[in-house]
């Protein structure tokens, strides 16, 4: 029987690089992934016409993250909310059992506004849009430990609620003019997948 091999020695540069990579992997940890901390409440807002890929993909990633973290408790608690208890998705599937838009959101939390079909997002007079926009104005995500995350054209709802004032933002490649109309004092960054402000 041979002795177990010693782990390879790492140079100071390799060690620093490994720490940086480990730190990058834990980027969301700044708000709830530390051991013993509160889980992050993640509110996916799903009005009519929501693109399933825009919320199901991120929700699955967070669910998977919960399974990979220590078993004590999840880092993310997922909530699916909307003005109505059921919402017709982008592909015609009805998403039911949605919770109402909460009256308050306490930190740590994320509010995720997802993209929608072009027909759903273009109606300025839409009742559901007005309810979501009024709700966003009340709960003011993006402040006091409640992060605002917009996916694709979900940025248009945040812009309509006035949440992008003097912010650096992006949206779906087909919507920069609409974003500029709704948030004229925001800095819209075109042709970007991410804009962090």
Model-derived segments and spans:
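Extended, subdomain-level signal for the structured scaffold at the beginning of enzyme domains
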Residues: 1-148, 157-160, 190
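Alpha-helix N-cap/helix-start capping motif
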Residues: 151-155, 173
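Phosphate- and divalent-cation-binding pockets in alpha/beta enzyme and binding domains
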Residues: 156-157, 178
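A conserved active-site-flanking secondary-structure segment within enzyme catalytic domains
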Residues: 165-193
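Conserved anion/nucleotide-ligand pocket segment
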Residues: 196-197
């Amino acid at each position: 029987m041979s002795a177990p091999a010693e782990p390879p020695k790492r140079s100071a540069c390799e060690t620093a690089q490994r720490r940086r990579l480990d730190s990058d992997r834990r980027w969301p940890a700044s708000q709830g992934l530390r051991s013993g901390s509160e889980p992050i409440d993640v509110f996916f807002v799903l009005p009519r016409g929501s693109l399933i890929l825009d919320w199901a993909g991120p929700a699955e990633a967070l669910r998977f993250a919960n399974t990979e973290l220590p078993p004590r408790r999840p880092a993310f608690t997922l909530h699916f909310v909307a003005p109505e208890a059921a919402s017709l998705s982008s592909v015609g599937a009805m998403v039911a059992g949605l919770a109402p838009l909460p009256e308050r959101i306490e930190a740590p939390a994320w509010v995720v506004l997802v993209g929608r079909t072009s027909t759903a997002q273009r109606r300025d007079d839409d009742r559901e849009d007005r309810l979501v926009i009024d709700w966003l104005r009340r709960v003011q995500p993006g402040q006091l430990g409640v992060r605002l995350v917009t996916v694709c054209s979900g940025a248009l709802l945040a812009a309509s609620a006035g949440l992008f004032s003097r912010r650096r933002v992006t949206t779906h490649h087909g919507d920069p003019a609409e974003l500029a109309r709704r948030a004229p004092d925001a800095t819209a960054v075109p042709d970007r997948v991410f804009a962090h402000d």
